[in-house]
């Protein structure tokens, strides 16, 4: 049949008995010559070029992603843990770059190094510092650096976690407490002070986090008080039973313990209702923290360039140690075909 069709197309002397075949072949030839057919062919060719360009673009993005290096900040909302947010960021970047693809997963040495320094509770929001590439080596400096928080405390109620997510363990009256009473005791919590960390924290006993032991219902003994630093603290608002504090502190300081201690000092009790980290090191919530719609390779590259001026050059080579073991440093070395790892919830502020 193929020979006949070829013959029909090339031989106009053949007539009636082969006319259907001649019509079909002729139609195809005619279509190829029409403007619409040429346009269709052009579309197909353009699509092929677009697909090729897309592959090149993805490869370029993947190369750019793996070349990113430095420290930047993201805006952590209430809800996810810091580890969950880091996974979400990682997944968005890998998806944008089309990774992992077969070409990349075969190259097992290609890794995306990403981590965060200074965990925020799931119930807290604010600045979360992220390191990428060799920037992960700089994250330990974030743990010992200064941090600033806005905290809303609630008088008259204590919980086992020292915040509103915990089980209520005690209730006391607060109706006689005045704004002047609160302002009058804040000086006691300023400067170099001793602080007992919360039971629900990343501190460990026999290699296990105290928070994990508490979840199991095990009895956990309080850790001894240790030295911490509060650079400044002020009362921003008082509308009983709620009070708002602005606190700037050093590493290893717990806002939840501060609010609880303030309640006790006032002969009542208190817990943290809302917590926002407004600054960590040189990063501020307003100027530097990227919202989720800016978690793109290009936006992060621009942020890294902008934030590079915030650090002295020698800091990139400095490898400082965390002041204490509850200051969790999460540095993920993500091999592109490595399965996800679930992290426990850790409270560190």
Curated annotation (Swiss-Prot):
Keywords: Acetylation, Cytoplasm, Isomerase, mRNA processing, Nucleus, Phosphoprotein, tRNA processing. It is found in: Nucleus; Cytoplasm, Cytosol. GO terms for biological process: mRNA processing; mRNA pseudouridine synthesis; positive regulation of pre-miRNA processing; tRNA modification. It comes from the Eukaryota. Highly expressed in heart, skeletal muscle and liver. Expressed at lower levels in lung, small intestine, kidney and spleen. The modification Phosphoserine is found at residue 11. The active site is at residue 121. GO terms for cellular component: cytosol; mitochondrion; nucleus. The modification N-acetylalanine is found at residue 2. It catalyses: a uridine in mRNA = a pseudouridine in mRNA; a uridine in tRNA = a pseudouridine in tRNA; uridine(55) in tRNA = pseudouridine(55) in tRNA. Its EC number is 5.4.99.-, 5.4.99.25. Disulfide bonds: none annotated. One of its GO terms (molecular function) is pre-miRNA binding. CDD domains: PseudoU_synth_TruB_4. Changing residue 163 to A: Abolished pseudouridine synthase activity without affecting ability to promote processing of let-7 miRNAs. NCBIfam families: TruB. PANTHER family: PSEUDOURIDYLATE SYNTHASE TRUB1, TRNA-PSEUDOURIDINE SYNTHASE. Belongs to the pseudouridine synthase TruB family. HAMAP family: TruB_bact. Pseudouridine synthase that catalyzes pseudouridylation of mRNAs and tRNAs. Mediates pseudouridylation of mRNAs with the consensus sequence 5'-GUUCNANNC-3', harboring a stem-loop structure. Constitutes the major pseudouridine synthase acting on mRNAs. Also catalyzes pseudouridylation of some tRNAs, including synthesis of pseudouridine(55) from uracil-55, in the psi GC loop of a subset of tRNAs. Promotes the processing of pri-let-7 microRNAs (pri-miRNAs) independently of its RNA pseudouridylate synthase activity. This is Pseudouridylate synthase TRUB1.
């Amino acid at each position: 049949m193929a020979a006949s069709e070829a013959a029909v197309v090339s031989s106009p002397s053949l007539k009636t008995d082969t006319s259907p075949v001649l019509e079909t072949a002729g139609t195809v030839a005619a279509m190829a010559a029409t403007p619409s057919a040429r346009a269709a062919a052009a579309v197909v060719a353009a699509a092929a070029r677009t697909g090729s360009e897309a592959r090149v673009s993805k490869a370029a993005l993947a190369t750019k992603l793996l070349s990113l290096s430095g420290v930047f900040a993201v805006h952590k909302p209430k809800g996810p843990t810091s580890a969950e947010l880091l996974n979400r960021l990682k997944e968005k970047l890998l998806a944008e770059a089309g990774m992992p693809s077969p070409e990349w997963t075969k190259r097992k040495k290609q890794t995306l190094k990403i981590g965060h320094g200074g965990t925020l509770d799931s119930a807290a929001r604010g600045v979360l510092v992220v390191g990428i590439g060799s920037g992960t080596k700089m994250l330990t400096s974030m743990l010992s650096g200064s941090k600033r928080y806005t905290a809303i405390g609630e008088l008259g109620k204590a919980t086992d976690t020292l915040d509103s997510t915990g089980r209520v363990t005690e209730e006391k009256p607060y109706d006689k407490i005045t704004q002047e009473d609160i302002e009058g005791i804040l000086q006691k919590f300023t400067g170099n002070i001793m602080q007992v960390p919360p039971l629900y924290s990343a501190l460990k006993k026999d290699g296990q986090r105290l928070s994990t032991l508490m979840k199991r219902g095990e009895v956990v003994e309080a850790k001894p008080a240790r030295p911490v630093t509060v650079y400044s603290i002020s009362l921003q608002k008082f509308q009983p039973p709620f009070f708002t504090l602005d606190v700037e502190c050093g590493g290893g300081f717990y806002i939840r313990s501060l609010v609880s201690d303030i309640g006790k000092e006032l002969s009542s009790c208190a817990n943290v209702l809302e917590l926002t980290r407004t600054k960590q090191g040189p990063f501020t919530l307003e100027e530097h923290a990227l919202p989720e719609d800016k978690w793109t390779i290009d936006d992060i590259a621009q942020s890294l360039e902008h934030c590079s001026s915030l650090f002295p050059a020698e800091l990139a080579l400095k490898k400082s140690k965390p002041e204490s073991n509850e200051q969790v440093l999460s540095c993920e070395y993500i091999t592109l075909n490595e399965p996800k790892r679930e992290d426990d919830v850790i409270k560190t502020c």
